[in-house]
């Protein structure tokens, strides 16, 4: 299983990669000095510094892919199906592949993976981590969390991010007073596709046979709405949980789209 060693390496770092955060913060400060529009600033950086333009293509031209790098045309091609948060993330992901390559290469080598598949998955996780850190720079994000009382929906609006992007970012706050969060993503069958304990050490991340009354499951009955729940375990410990459904980007109008529940 190529995923298992990747999960072990992420948990070894408690899903906090300080070098990537530092690089993303520095770059975010540079980009925001000239523009309040992060997507526009990233696009300008790609164009001026790396000779890559961003082109939004209709679904008829990109019927399957949501993101494609065309080096011959020097274009990062994005599907029109991507919402603004996903477009910014895709642009930040591409910029990270170029400007954070040193930090990412070092972390991948330190993982000592025996399979190339695991190495590729880990590299993708680190690239995604950098993209999220560029959209939600560490210190600025922690201050916003404290100022808003960790209001996830307000954080989404403030940083132009999606619910799942904010949820994942919350699991990375292992320094500077960040509260310990975990994150789980499941499908309707209860199969998990993302599990991050972060600094929480929550047993809920590894729990098998999860209760159907759990907010993570009941969120499917209230799609798009935030479900809140206080969970008490057999040992007396209690965990406050938020859950909401999310759907992956893509798919034409009328098509059945996969749905997941994300809980923190």
Protein language model annotation of sequence segments:
Residues 1-264:
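Short juxta-domain linker segments that transition from a proline/glycine-rich
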């Amino acid at each position: 299983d190529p995923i298992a060693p990747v999960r072990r390496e992420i948990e070894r770092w408690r899903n906090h990669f300080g070098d990537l955060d530092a690089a993303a913060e520095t770059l975010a400060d540079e980009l925001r000095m000239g523009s309040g529009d992060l997507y526009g600033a990233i696009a300008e950086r790609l164009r001026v510094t790396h000779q890559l333009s961003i082109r939004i293509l209709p679904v008829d031209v990109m019927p399957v892919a949501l993101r494609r790098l065309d080096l011959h045309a020097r274009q990062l091609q994005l599907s029109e199906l991507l919402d603004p948060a996903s477009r910014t993330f895709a642009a930040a992901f591409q910029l990270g592949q170029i400007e954070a390559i040193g930090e990412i290469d070092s972390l991948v080598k330190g993982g000592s993976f025996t399979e190339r598949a695991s190495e590729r998955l880990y590299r993708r996780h680190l690239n995604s981590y950098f993209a999220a850190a560029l959209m939600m720079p560490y210190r600025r994000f922690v201050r916003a969390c404290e100022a808003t009382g960790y209001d996830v929906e307000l954080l989404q609006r403030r940083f132009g991010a999606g619910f799942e992007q904010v949820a994942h970012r919350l699991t990375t706050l292992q320094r500077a007073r960040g509260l310990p969060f975990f994150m789980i993503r499941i499908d309707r069958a209860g199969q998990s596709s993302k599990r991050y304990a972060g600094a929480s050490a929550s047993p809920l991340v590894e729990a098998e046979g999860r209760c159907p009354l759990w907010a993570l499951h009941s969120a499917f009955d209230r799609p798009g709405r935030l479900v809140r729940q206080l969970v008490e375990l057999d040992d007396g410990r209690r965990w406050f949980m938020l859950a909401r459904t999310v759907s992956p980007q893509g798919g034409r109008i009328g098509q059945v789209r996969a749905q997941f529940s994300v809980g923190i």
